[in-house]
């Protein structure tokens, strides 16, 4: 059995009310307090609008949920409530529903974010260090509260570049971590799925988020979005194996006594690891440093137990400048 290296027993020692989301009694607010301004996006499970609170004129984001199991909605609400006020976690303001259709909506703080496909190519080396560090604060916090996000990707990281403000959003796939529990492997978005999901290891943990973060980081420093571009879940593992090598994959499978299905094994083939230096080119070399490569290498490990935790990641030398700037800013406040 595999268990998390950190924050293993958070939900074991907390009262049942903390993690037992099925028992949540939702306190509904008033839908009339909000009006929709414009549509800003849609996901598999929701449509998202910019809105405003008609009483205060304050901008907000309204996430109108598509018909989905009540249990899943309660899970998202409970997690958002548990994490509210944590560093760089999107704030849930209210939960409302339509009187007639009973369609629930979640009301969040507004973040004036730019599409990552537009923003990322403009980021400097320092910007990337800064924003990844801000994202790590959110991840370490949610992990410390016994929660895995399970859908870390650029689309779920809102950045207001003018205010240098980052928020981790969309907690719809997030789940409470219970040691030894077997989870659904059909989570995360394909390009950010950890090897554990692709080889059907079900007793995964917070370290799944660290793989997804590694994929996101690789995309940013190498300017290759997405970094692992699989056409389906099988091909996703092939794309990973072509970079990390197949001996290392075998080692991982053996350690956890897993077998690949023969069809997948044939697709994966045999590959030697590809050095990270092979991804450096004239376009991205200003973003790649020895410490960036070292940091990436410690995230993109097949074995989830070998990946840096969010806390360990924050202590990596890659963030030394960011931490120095942060402590001097705090001193001068």
Swiss-Prot record:
Pfam family membership, one: Pkinase
Catalytic residues (positions): 151 (proton acceptor)
Binding residues annotated for ATP, in chain numbering: 40-48, 63
Catalysed reactions, semicolon-separated: L-seryl-[protein] + ATP = O-phospho-L-seryl-[protein] + ADP + H(+); L-threonyl-[protein] + ATP = O-phospho-L-threonyl-[protein] + ADP + H(+)
Localization (cell): Nucleus; Nucleus, Nucleolus; Cytoplasm
GO annotation, cellular component aspect: cytoplasm; nucleolus; nucleus
GO biological process: chromatin organization; circadian rhythm; DNA repair; regulation of cell cycle; regulation of circadian rhythm; response to gamma radiation; response to UV-C
Top-level taxon: Eukaryota
GO MF, any single term: ATP binding
Alphabetical list of InterPro entries matching this protein: CK2_alpha, Kinase-like_dom_sf, Prot_kinase_dom, Protein_kinase_ATP_BS, Ser/Thr_kinase_AS
Described function: Casein kinases are operationally defined by their preferential utilization of acidic proteins such as caseins as substrates. The alpha chain contains the catalytic site. The tetrameric holoenzyme CK2 is composed of two alpha and two beta subunits. Acts as a circadian clock component that maintains the correct period length through phosphorylation of CCA1.
Protein name: Casein kinase II subunit alpha-3
């Amino acid at each position: 059995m595999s268990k998390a290296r950190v924050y293993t027993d958070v939900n074991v020692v907390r009262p049942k009310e903390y993690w037992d989301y099925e028992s949540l009694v939702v306190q509904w607010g008033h839908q009339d307090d909000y009006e929709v301004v414009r549509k800003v996006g849609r996901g598999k499970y929701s449509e998202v609008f910019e809105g405003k609170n008609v009483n205060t004129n304050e901008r907000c984001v309204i996430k109108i949920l598509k018909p989905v199991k009540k249990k899943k909605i309660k899970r998202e609400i409970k997690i958002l409530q548990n994490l509210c006020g944590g560093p760089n976690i999107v704030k849930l303001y209210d939960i409302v529903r339509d009187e007639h259709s009973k369609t629930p909506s979640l009301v969040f703080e507004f973040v004036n974010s730019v599409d990552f496909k537009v923003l990322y190519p403009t980021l400097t080396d320092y910007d990337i260090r800064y924003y990844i560090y801000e994202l790590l604060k959110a991840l370490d916090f949610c992990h410390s509260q016994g929660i895995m996000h399970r859908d870390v990707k650029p689309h779920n990281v809102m950045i207001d570049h003018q205010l240098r403000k980052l928020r981790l959003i969309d907690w719809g796939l997030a789940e409470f971590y219970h040691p030894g529990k077997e989870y659904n492997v059909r989570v995360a978005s394909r390009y950010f799925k950890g090897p554990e999901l692709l080889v059907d290891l079900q007793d995964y943990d917070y370290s799944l988020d660290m793989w997804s973060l590694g994929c996101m980081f690789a995309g940013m420093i190498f300017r290759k979005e997405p970094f692992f571009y699989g056409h389906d879940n099988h091909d996703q593992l092939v794309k990973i194996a072509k970079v990390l090598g197949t001996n290392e994959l075998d080692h991982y499978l053996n350690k956890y006594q897993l077998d690949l299905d023969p069809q997948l094994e044939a697709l994966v083939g045999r590959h030697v690891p590809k050095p990270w230096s092979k991804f450096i080119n004239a376009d991205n070399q200003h973003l790649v440093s020895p410490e960036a490569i070292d940091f990436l290498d410690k995230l993109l490990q097949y074995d989830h137990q070998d990946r840096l935790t969010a806390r360990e990641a924050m202590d990596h030398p890659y963030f030394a400048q960011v931490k120095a700037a942060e402590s001097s800013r705090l001193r001068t406040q």
